[in-house]
Every structure is written in C-alpha cells, then in structure tokens.
Amino acid sequence: MRKPLLKARQLLLLAYLLAAVLWVVRCLVGCGVMLNYKLQGKMPQTHVDAAELVTESFAPYSSNEWWTPPDDDPAWYLSTDSDPHIYWQGQGYIETAVLDAAHRLPPGGVALYYLKPGQTDYTEAQKVYAKVTAPGVYTFDLGGQWVTGLRIDPDSVGGVPTLFTGIDLNPLHPWYTRFVP
C-alpha cells in the first residue's frame, strides 16, 4: 500500500498557508491599483455637502412651509415616498462611500447603486447595502470600482425625517485596514 504524500494535518496546514499568501497578494494588488488611481488624480477623496447633491423624493424641510423639522438644524430632510434617491454625478475610482444620515424613524434598507462607464440605468446587479459603522453613519464598500455615478437610497419606507449632511467619497483610513477582512 502506498503512503499518502501528505498527512491530513499537513494538507490542512498547507491549505491555510496558501490561503494566507493569496490574501496578502490580493491586498497588495488592491493597494497597487488604489495607489495608481490616486497618483493619477482619478480617485476622489472628498466630502460632498448635501447642497451639492441632486435629490429625488428627498427634500429639505425648508422647501415646504407646512413641514415642521424635528429641531432647528437646517440639515433635516424628509423622504416624500418609499423610494427616495440621492445622486452624485461624477466619475472616479471609488472604494468606499460614507453616508452621514441620522434617521428619526427606522429607515428600512439603505442601499447604494453605481453606474459603470457606458451605463445609463442603475441595476440591482450593481447594488451595495450599507454597513452601519456608527450612529447615523452608513458605509458602503464598493471594493474598488470605476464609476460614472452613484445613487443612494437613504430609506425604503417613506416619511422618514433624516438629518443629512452629505457623503464622503473614499474617506481616509489607515493603510493596514486593507489587510483586515
């Protein structure tokens, strides 16, 4: 009878080692791609104020004299139907987008859609759900995409008062976080 080349434990150790090496290579390639776009000036790292964004079915309380905001802050918005949109019109390499929006009622789903070059319509195939990283902070991880537009759906129920200050595109974060799964 022939002995197996590697025992089960050795094979498992080899598989884990190979996975770790592939993870590091993947992260280094991602760093290289990001650095390339950043050096070419094609990776926006900016905060976009609410006034600079286009909204649909998502209006500031100040736009209607009959609406009463929850407090005196001028950044309160109200979704006027169950499918409000916030649009960023621009292009660039986007890894992460962060929505600053504190909701007074449960928002349902908060999602981001992105357009790739040549597209005109947003599709479910290019949809990213938010991860709540702090109260009122929704982070979308696009995994590094060249986009020609973003659409954020800040809630999916309608009638939700939202303290909305804008979005951050590719916010700064420590380099080593790329290696954390």
Go through each PLM region and give its residues.
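Solvent-exposed strand-loop boundary residues in beta-sheet-rich modules
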Residues: 116-120, 158, 173
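N-terminal Sec-pathway targeting helices
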Residues: 2-21
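Glycan-recognition and processing domains
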Residues: 20-91, 168-181
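Edge beta-strands of jelly-roll/beta-sandwich modules across compartments, strongly enriched
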Residues: 158-172
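Short beta-strand-plus-loop segments that form exposed binding edges in beta-rich domains
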Residues: 151-159
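Polyanion-binding and phosphate-handling cores
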Residues: 81-83, 148-151, 163-165
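Extracellular ligand-binding interfaces
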Residues: 69-141, 146
